[in-house]
Amino acid sequence: MPGARLVASHILNFGESSTVKNPTSIRLSRISLALAMALGSNVVLAQSTTGSIFGQAPAAEGETVQARSSSGVTREVTVGSDGRYTVGSLPLGTYTVSLVQGGKVVDTRSDITLRVGSGTEVSFAAASGATTSLGAVTVSANSLPAIDVSSVDARTVITSQQLAQLPLARSAEAIALLAPGVVPGYSGFTSGTTGTSLVSFSGSSVTENAYYLNGFNTTDPLSGFGGISLPYGAIDQQEILSGGYGAAYGRSDGGVISQSGKRGTDEWHFGAQVQWTPAFARGTSPNSYYVSGANDGEIYRRYSQNKSWETTESAYVGGPLIKDKLFFFAAVEGDKRSGNSLGAVTSSYNTQYQYSNPKWYTKVDWNINDNNILELTGASTKTSYKGNLYNYDYDTKQTGDLNSFDTSTKNSAQVSIAKYTSYITDDITLTALYGKQKMTYFSQTPGYDPSLTYINGSEFENPAITGGNSIVNAQTVLTADNPNHRATSNNLRLDLSWKLGDHTITAGIDNLNSHDIDDGQTGNAWIYAFGDPSTPISDSPFVAAPNTGAGGETGYYVSKYLYSTSASVRVKQRAQYIEDSWQVDDRWLVKIGLRNDQFTNYNPNGDAYLRMTKPQWAPRVGFSWDVHGDSSLKVYANAGRYYLAMPASVALRAAAGSLYTNQYYTYTGIDANGNPTGLTPLASATGGAVSANNEYGQSPDAKTVASSSIRSEYQDEYLLGFTQQINADYVWGMKGQVRKLRNILDDICDTGTIAAKAQALGYDIDPTTLNGCYLSNPGRANTYRIVNPAGGYYSVDVTKEDFGMPHAKRSYYGLETFLEHPFDGVWQAKIDYVYSKSYGDSEGQVRSDIGQSDVSATVDWDFGKVMENSNGLLSNDRKHQLKIYGSWQVAPEWMLSGNIALLSGTPKTCLGYYGADESNPVGYGSYYHYCGGVASAPGAAGRQPWQHIVSLSAEYRPVWADKKLGFNVMVYNLLNESVATSTYALYGNSKALNTNYDRINYFSTPRYVRFGINYDF
């Protein structure tokens, strides 16, 4: 469906600074490491907040290994007859691991830090003490295992120590950009609750990712736009899974962002931080100009007078309430941003705005006993905005009097999680997690005047009437949200892990429910437009040419736009999985998993309109081969299928009865408020308002909303790679990744073809009673139910050939290579390069080139003619990605860090009217894959420019303050390069070129400097 919502321009914003801490270095034997990683079998659930410890010890009768954390967790397991042991499902933290023989500790390893989702090797030999040496080779526990031969996926884990060293923005998405294959998404797509910019994983759309917080799914239940994340200082570790993840994960065919929060220990710690980005240290993007049509060369939007400043204040405290038993951690963060933003010349206001983004996080850990742990988590994030609109004169560059108040928003999300872990035996672990998420979405416009109609497209007002100066009014609201809108979700997980010899079997259930309450929008506007005077505005539904009405002789016309959606809907998702981690021998590890997902979406009446509950088997298979048996070279591979659920918001336009109409007129005048006068209605198929998608407000029968043969969207993925230890200091590797989208779910609106097929079958139907659009599997044959006037339903099979549509496809190919030097107490760095290609005829659930956020209800697949020439480079294609980041401890008191991203530009699209004659056969205007009458596939219009983002930071921690006090400065985008990331894609036609075509919509973030002071005790 053509996008109905207008969005204001924003600036893509990734990149902030951090503080520095020095990890303690513990030396372990590399040979011992290799043995244990080759022989140890350990499984950690991908979305869990746990890790494991495994290794080798000299076999002795009654020998055990004891692991004790800084938060009092103690586990003791028996060493097997082969000398192997595994301590699984351990809460993250720092551990002391001891070898016990005859009831006495004979050897100990201290300061062992776990990584989420990973195994940490700790091996023992006959020697005692904190260091074991075999030959002349020793290794550091903090930098190794450099090669994890127990993993088969594409995983990046960023720890709190790294976050304290690297110049990064304070968001989950900015951290995720460190991972290979993860790139910024379309700048206009932001998280509905937090407002942060979103990311794309390996060619997938930004709505196909999953977010987790302490094991709980916090993905936006309404549309999949982002998820809830922690205060930056409360993040212990962030796990980024970009491919190959196990059966415990689902509902994602993009990537996974999983955050684990900090917890209290047996020592009290507290700290605070203040960061400040002043206006004088922030650059501005270049001004945006028209580059086409009648306004070519004129300014569109001025950025040079925009100013903003930001402050972030945060604090934390954590420690024992009862030593070794009960622990507490809490963190708060307050971010405030103020400034001004000039609107476009068509809406020339200077908006003085304020943002406020408070967050908090608490965690309580109760070690009931050595075998049972209870964890309670609470978290909250809020985002509020308010602004005043002042008149602005683009000619004089002066700001005038207050015009009106901008729409203010207050969004919030609160999360509550309880997790129980029971170590039933040394080999059996049960985990139960239950969490709730409550969200509110409030907006209002102070002084809103409903008597004023929003004016859209004022640049297309007839200059013979206006004299070339746009006429608008004080109305700034196109669509108004329901102020009572709220949502809830809950997630129940049960996971059981059982070690049976060389096999570790993990199985569980993953149930997620969400409820979208009082969601909806209403809007109306006058939309001015310009076209060929003698060409019908639309062929289907028919709207006559402009020159058939008074005042339309030169091609100028206007439409009265009405839009309304309103609903309360819910979604039920269920899943079951099982996975076997099989240590075949000392070099081969095989992981075999199977997941089954079921998805059901309900309309406002509680009737299921999408019921995909038949088995949706998602196999996951992978292996790891320790080639030499010493962990110096790993070859691994993975293959899997991933299903994607439909979020709640799909029901608003598909199943709840939406109104989306335009009534067309010519006009002979425009009043002082921008309203057209002297209106002459243009002839239309309905005699009045028309809807290209038959959205006239009727509520569809739930059984007819979707194809009866519909299946979920799913993707197949394949990984093949290797990682090699070059020497004691460097690791390099390569990885190939292939993704194939096998099935998509979107709406098809070609009801004429469905009606014709039904009539050809002899069915007696009234075409005007059909739904506006049907949820379908485009590119495949679909079966539709049509209401039988006598009762019951007709069943109509329609093929993709009937619709004139191509086969649906999205393919991604990526080749990655990297070189890494782990932190050795002095410096660390990683260089990562990805060469990739993403192409096909469907980006996914949303469409970036036109900024359309209607999930699975985009322009794509509505009609066969809008899919002609649609196969090309997709919007998230980045041919080249080079990422370099690292830190250097220049002196005991000084740390320098850098983060560099060199990214090739995304493809550009040119969309125009249909065919060589530039007609409009299905009423979609300039949304066909033709440009000036010539076929134009995605990417045929070229690419956006490269982005070269160089960010540096420095921190000073003086010895006189015992290094507890830190002063830091960070410069984001040192080169101050601000380039186009998105341009306007609608060409219009050769006789009436759209003057907006190819003008810049969004720029990359210009340079800014951030200063900080922090204290950690």
Stretch-by-stretch model annotation:
Residues K325-F328, N371-L374, D427-L430, D502-I505, ...:
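Repeated loop/turn-to-beta-strand initiation elements of outer-membrane beta-barrel proteins
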Residues N469, P604, R611-A618, G622-F803, ...:
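Solvent-exposed loop/turn elements at secondary-structure boundaries
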Residues D729, N743, C749, K837-Y839, ...:
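C-terminal beta-signal and adjacent terminal beta-strands/loops
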Residues G103-A127, G135-R263, G297-R301, E310, ...:
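Periplasmic N-terminal accessory/gating domains of Gram-negative outer-membrane beta-barrel systems
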Residues H269, Y303-G387, S408-T431, P619:
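Transmembrane beta-barrel wall of Gram-negative outer-membrane proteins
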